[in-house]
Amino acid sequence: MAACRCCDTSPGITLFPYFAILILILAILVVGTPNQQYHHSPSTYEYKTQHISIAK
């Protein structure tokens, strides 16, 4: 809990690494998702249409 005392003195500096990690993960997801969506969109679209037709 000693880290909390450091956070009180300079919250911006201590939180910066967490924001950097979040931005990195978001960047990887944004770069990676278009390829996955492009490859998987036909199958997921067919699955959704079949699911909707079964529900009706």
Curated annotation (Swiss-Prot):
Q: How does it sit in the membrane?
A: Single-pass membrane protein
Task: State where it is primarily located.
Answer: membrane
Give compartment(s).
Membrane
Keywords, A to Z, come to: Membrane, Transmembrane, Transmembrane helix
Segments of this protein annotated with the region Hydrophobic: 19-31
Q: Which domain of life is it from?
A: Viruses
Q: Which GO terms describe its cellular component?
A: membrane
Q: Where are the transmembrane segments?
A: 12-32
Query: What's the protein called, per UniProt?
Result: Uncharacterized protein p6
* Organism for this UniProt entry: Tobacco necrosis virus (strain A)
